[in-house]
Amino acid sequence: MAKVQYFGTGRRKKSVARVILVPGDGKVTINKRDIEVYFGLETLRYIVNQPLVLTGTKDKFDVIVNVNGGGFTGQAGAIRHGITRALVKADETLKPELKKAGFLTRDPRMKERKKYGLKKARRAPQFSKR
């Protein structure tokens, strides 16, 4: 018998997360490591689990994630986006609830490019009057 799997791709800043939802007991694996090992901060684990807790599907699916690029916060946001998309594929009735919470929306904020003549994107070199 073929296993039922739901796929979702999430993005945030420079991070890309490929998420697979498999019916199970709520185990979250990120890059072949447990979520507690991968994300040390409680806030990042909270961000990842938000869509599952909101929809009440925390202990119905095992989450397998492959994520790369960006930093910890970007990766957590990308995983949340991917889980949300996979949940919508699994059950279309969850879409309005997830949309209202803002989890389906791709966060468009990216790092602003550095401009010439400046030290960073907006930081100007120190000004000296004399």
Curated annotation (Swiss-Prot):
PROSITE patterns: RIBOSOMAL_S9 (PS00360). Residues 111-130 have a biased composition (Basic residues). Keywords: Ribonucleoprotein, Ribosomal protein. Transmembrane segments: none annotated. Residues 102-130 are annotated as: Disordered. InterPro entries: Ribosomal_Su5_D2-typ_SF, Ribosomal_uS9, Ribosomal_uS9_bac/plastid, Ribosomal_uS9_CS, Ribsml_uS5_D2-typ_fold_subgr. GO terms for cellular component: cytosolic small ribosomal subunit. Disulfide bonds: none annotated. Belongs to the universal ribosomal protein uS9 family. This is Small ribosomal subunit protein uS9.
